[in-house]
Design a protein with these regions (language model features):
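Short, Lys/Arg-enriched N-terminal segments with co-localized hydrophobic residues
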Residues: 1-8
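Sec-dependent N-terminal signal peptides of Gram-positive bacterial secreted proteins and lipoproteins
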Residues: 14-31
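Acidic/aromatic-lined carbohydrate-recognition and catalytic surfaces
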Residues: 30-217, 221-222, 227, 241, ...
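Active-site-proximal helices and loops of the catalytic beta/alpha 8
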Residues: 35-44, 150, 158-176, 234-235, ...
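Alpha-helical packing segments of well-folded alpha/beta enzyme cores
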Residues: 84, 127, 131, 228-239, ...
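Loop/helix patches that line or flank the sugar-binding groove of alpha-linked glycan CAZymes
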Residues: 364-505, 512, 539
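Solvent-exposed beta-hairpin/edge-strand motifs
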Residues: 509-525
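C-terminal beta-strand-rich structural cap/linker in extracellular carbohydrate-active enzymes
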Residues: 530-550
Length: 550
């Protein structure tokens, strides 16, 4: 009996020991389910955002003609934009910039024939008012392209000006309207009066010339005339009263051809008039020039100017050339980050990579590089601008403008727009990429990568607004850049692995940071940023970690 009891006790001990071992290793096994090649997989918050109502956001540039066709005529329209506002919002954009929507004789509509009318191809004023209302319901700001340095040659303003000038030259009696319009545009009495570098054309049925630096259909307004300012104020008031949140000003160097100080005076007056109507109106200007010139234009008080030196237009731009370079990639990008801020001074930087006038940046790099470049853009201070279609990897060379204004492929039963006339046959062979619908379903797509970049940006207000300090930089391996950004008493760290091939391990705690709170990884479905058992973090190639300050 004692022997049996002893055997039972022995069996019990073995069972208990076995159970204990099972429990211990079971727990370890469970906890290690999240432990892989890159350490512990961090649980991320993929829903919460912290969006502030200011001018530091993420804008989405839309060429309406090629965006979404709501009525089946092959031409994108305002109702199509309204239909896709949820798509834009879900991506993480906080504002939209509409390329010109006014009545025009061209496909691009930069020659405006009526500043107070919507082009019939795009819809009606009621459609536009609905779009504004629906934007604001979703917390999306809307700015429109305002072309104020020139109008269209079919604009009644130009016709009135030419007729008044003809009467003036003939010595005929001028009406009050004639007096107003005879100097409304920049006219030259003879070809010898045309300044060097300025392009001018003979006015219709007249002996004099008019300035038109872009095309004969785009006569330049004369900002020596007070009546031009009156008209500009009326135009801005018309749209601000309808609820637009501001304007993108086209070609601001051409109010007075390359006369920068005079252009700054014009912009200062335009800005003052807009702010008198709506103090919160946001204005961004197109000054396609160097850092030195753009810095002069900020003296106008305009909120933002596009940072062309950092874009694809600059062969040495810090976003494109901040990767895949030997020895200086980190410094190139870091210095660019700082210059982006100092250039704007007290105003709002407006970094971008490409737009409707440039090659699409995805045409210049491979798939992984292009994704990482957008991640670099999303880490910059200011108000970023993204060109429609970039979020699905659309390509486009600059043989002709039409090549970079091709329709998005939605992958739906309707909505795709027809091609614009003039797209080159070479470009059509490259017009093959997964549709929007396909990319939404693909974890590793451009679409989902852009969405993640914008989510991280929207979760951390410090990214767009914070003061930058360098934590550490490893120039020897050309991999590690670690910076901090502090805003409103809160500080985060941003750790970059610039290597396209190699992992990076770093002890963030030695710099005072606690944990990873967000991550961007180019190869998202295969790799992640993880915490190792020794407290360090391991980052795969082409990745960015947002880390919490201790």
């Amino acid at each position: 009996m004692e022997q049996l009891r002893g055997k039972i006790m022995k069996i019990r001990k073995i069972c208990l020991l076995s159970l204990l071992i099972t429990l211990i290793f079971g727990v370890v096994s469970c906890s290690d389910n999240k432990y892989g090649e890159y350490g512990y997989r961090i649980e991320e918050d993929l829903t919460t955002t912290n969006i502030i109502d200011d001018n530091y956001g993420n804008f989405y540039e839309i060429f309406v003609r090629s965006f979404y066709d709501s009525d089946g005529d092959g031409i994108g329209d305002l109702k199509g934009v309204t239909k896709k506002l949820d798509y834009i919002s879900e991506l993480g954009f906080t504002g939209i910039w509409l390329m010109p929507i006014n009545k025009s004789s061209s496909y691009h509509k930069y020659n405006v024939d009526d500043y107070y009318a919507i082009d019939y191809q795009y819809g009606t004023m009621a459609d536009f008012e609905e779009l504004i209302a629906e934007c604001h319901k979703r917390g999306i700001k809307i700015i429109i392209d305002l072309v104020l340095n020139h109008s269209g040659s079919n604009n009644p303003l130009f016709n009135k000006a030419v007729n008044a000038r003809i009467k003036y030259q003939a010595g005929l009696e001028l009406s009050e309207a004639d007096e107003k319009f005879k100097d409304f545009y920049t006219f030259f009495d003879s070809s010898s009066d045309i300044p060097k570098g300025v392009t001018a054309y003979k006015a219709p049925n007249a002996s004099f010339y008019y300035e038109a630096n872009f095309d004969s259909s785009m006569p330049e307004l004369n900002y020596d005339s007070p009546y031009v300012y009156e008209e500009v104020r009326n135009i801005m008031k018309f749209y601000l009263d309808k609820g637009v949140d501001g304007f993108r000003l086209d070609a601001v160097k051409y109010f007075y051809y390359n006369y920068h100080s005079k252009n700054v005076e014009v912009l200062s007056k335009i800005n003052q008039m807009a702010k008198e109507i709506n103090p919160k109106a946001y204005i961004v200007g197109e000054c396609w020039d160097s850092d030195a010139v753009i810095s002069q234009y900020y003296k106008s008080g305009i909120d933002s100017f596009f940072n062309f030196p950092g874009s694809v237009t600059n062969p040495n731009g810090y976003i494109l050339n901040g990767i895949n370079r030997e020895g200086d990639a980190l410094n190139t990008y870091y210095e660019g980050m700082l210059k982006n801020i100092t250039l704007a001074g007290e105003y709002v930087p407006a970094p971008f990579i490409d737009n409707h006038d440039t090659v699409r940046f995805t045409s210049t790099r491979n798939y992984r590089n292009s994704k990482f470049q957008y991640a670099l853009l999303s880490m910059l201070n200011g108000n970023t601008f993204t060109y429609y279609g970039d979020e699905v990897g659309m390509v486009g060379t600059k043989e002709v403008d039409q090549n970079v204004r091709i329709p998005i492929l939605w992958g739906e039963e309707s909505g795709d727009c027809s091609l614009i006339s003039g797209v080159t046959s070479h470009e059509l062979t490259r017009y093959i990429y997964p549709t929007v619908s396909e990319q939404i379903a693909d974890e590793d797509s451009f679409y989902n990568f852009y969405k993640k970049c914008l989510l991280i940006r929207n979760q951390n207000p410090e990214i767009a607004r914070g003061n930058i300090e360098l934590v550490t930089m490893d120039r020897d391996t050309d991999k590690l850049l670690f910076i901090s950004k502090e805003y409103n008493g809160n500080k985060i760290g941003i750790v970059f692995n610039f290597s396209p091939y190699y992992d990076l391990t770093i002890d963030i705690k030695q710099y005072g940071y606690e944990e990873v709170i967000g991550q961007i990884v180019v190869d998202n479905s295969e790799k992640y940023i993880g915490e190792l058992k020794d407290g360090k973090i391991k980052m795969p190639s082409y990745s960015i970690a947002i880390v919490k300050w201790g």
